[in-house]
Amino acid sequence: MSMYKVVVFVPVANADEMRQVIDDAGGGRMGNYSHASFSTRGIGRFKPLGGARPTIGEVDKIEEVEEERIEFVCSEDALQGVLAAIRKAHPYEEPAIDVWQLADIPRN
């Protein structure tokens, strides 16, 4: 079964809730472990354009937000459900989500 690395960027205030949403949907599972993720903090920048309904910031003004990058692994079976759960729970109108398929590395 294929595994994926998923990365989502979320405001720091929403990071704990997002990690729980990810786990509840089946992400962050590695062998006999759950809730497996890695996080780093940084500054997200964006400019809402006309027609946007930003949760944070104003249309036509560049906004900077302290965000947390949450990365975790996800099985192919759980991937679509995890992505749907992230989109539903994410505070942003257009959440930044990256997905990579991982190489199958045999265990010795």
Language model features with spans:
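Hydrophobic structural segments
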Residues: 1-108
